[in-house]
Amino acid sequence: ILERGDALLVVQWNIRAFTGVKKWPWMELYFEIEPLLKSAEAEKEMAAMKEEFGRIKESLEKSEARRKELEEKMVSLLQEKNDLQLQVQAEQDNLNDAEERCDQLIKNKIQLEAKVKEMNERLEDEEEMNAELTAKKRKLEDECSELKKDIDDLELTLAKVEKEKHATENKVKNLTEEMAGLDEIIAKLTKEKKALQEAHQQALDDLQAEEDKVNTLTKAKLKLEQQVDDLEGSLEQEKKVRMDLERAKRKLEGDLKLTQESIMDLENDKQQLEERLKKKEFDISQLNSKIEDEQALVLQLQKKLKENQARIEELEEELEAERTARAKVEKLRSDLSRELEEISERLEEAGGATSVQIEMNKKREAEFQKMRRDLEEATLQHEATASALRRKHADSVAELGEQIDNLQRVKQKLEKEKSEFKLELDDVTSNMEQIIKAKANLEKVSRTLEDQANEYRRKLEEAQR
């Protein structure tokens, strides 16, 4: 609303200013001159537009002439293009079959290279697994050595416990002897108590003290007997643990030996597979070279085959022309024979033939025989040439088919060897998985034995305390 109010004020101020100056003389003069200024500018613009129209018209005529010239060139170029397209199409039709065969051979080669690459990747995976297995083998050997060290420490601890047991047994024996002596003293004191009970009241107090002492010694005896039983139980437990550890140790050593033998067998299998893979790669490279040579030979044979086919077609055309000429000569001979017979009949009717006519007849007959022999020789020569070319063509086709069959047999052999190689790789993979499982089981048994040894060690420390 404020903006609209400001705008109204500005408009009102402009109108007020215009009404104030419109009656001035110079403003009236301006109003009269302004239309004249516009008409002068319009005439200048019209002259400029006419000049521009002339230039544009001249440019248009030049462009039209140039367009016609380009259209004529375009027609000629289109004609040449169509001719070239026809030639290219003809050449392309001739090359399609050869390109299809080459493409098929290239596809086969690419497939073989892909299969070789896949085998190489699998071999690299097997090598990585073998390296991991070797590292795990070293780790297992280290763990076995540590376990052996723990077993030796446990044996030293058992020997120490044996010594402590003997010392405890000696203490128990001494306490037993003391208890026997105390029993004798108690019996003696009891007898003295019964005999001197009335006379020795003070002795009763001493006897009560002695009984308290005996009770204390009895409790000590029971405690020592309990300790002896605990030590004997611990000793039996330690013996059992030692026997279990010995059995586990022997089992681990046997499993370790079997694992080492399996690893050696796998390394030998791996080395053999690597050698076979190198041999296969060499065979494949030779086969690729042979395939390239065969492809070049196939191209040469195809080129030669096309040349022979073209030559056969030319010879067949010549033979057909010779046959046509022979038919014409035969027709001419029959016409001449018929004419000769008619002449002979006329001469006979005329009453005889002159010597000139006889010579002419002989000359015609000789020329006819010569033409006939030349025609037969040419026909035989053309037929022999055509037969030789057909035989050569058949031999080339047979040779090409034999080479293709050889390539197919080599391909089937490689496919079979590839399948066998894949089965061997599967066997090696299965063996590696079994060894990994066996290793995991050994690690589990080792951890269990280590936990048991720690538990027994803790019990021994508690028993010693």
From Swiss-Prot:
Record keywords: Actin-binding, ATP-binding, Coiled coil, Cytoplasm, Motor protein, Muscle protein, Myosin, Nucleotide-binding, Phosphoprotein, Thick filament
Any one Gene Ontology molecular-function term assigned to this protein's record: microfilament motor activity
One CC-aspect GO term: myosin II complex
Protein's UniProt keywords contain ATP-binding: yes
Modified residues (Phosphoserine): S285, S334
Transmembrane annotation, as ranges: none
InterPro entries reported in the protein's UniProt record: Myosin_tail (IPR002928)
Myosin motor domain span: 1-35
Coiled-coil annotated residue ranges, if any: 36-465
Residues recorded as bearing Phosphotyrosine in the entry: Y456
Keyword Lyase: no
Compartments it resides in: Cytoplasm, Myofibril
Subunit comment: Muscle myosin is a hexameric protein that consists of 2 heavy chain subunits (MHC), 2 alkali light chain subunits (MLC) and 2 regulatory light chain subunits (MLC-2).
Domain notes: The rodlike tail sequence is highly repetitive, showing cycles of a 28-residue repeat pattern composed of 4 heptapeptides, characteristic for alpha-helical coiled coils.
Function, as annotated: Muscle contraction.
Protein name per Swiss-Prot or TrEMBL: Myosin-6
Native source species: Oryctolagus cuniculus (Rabbit)
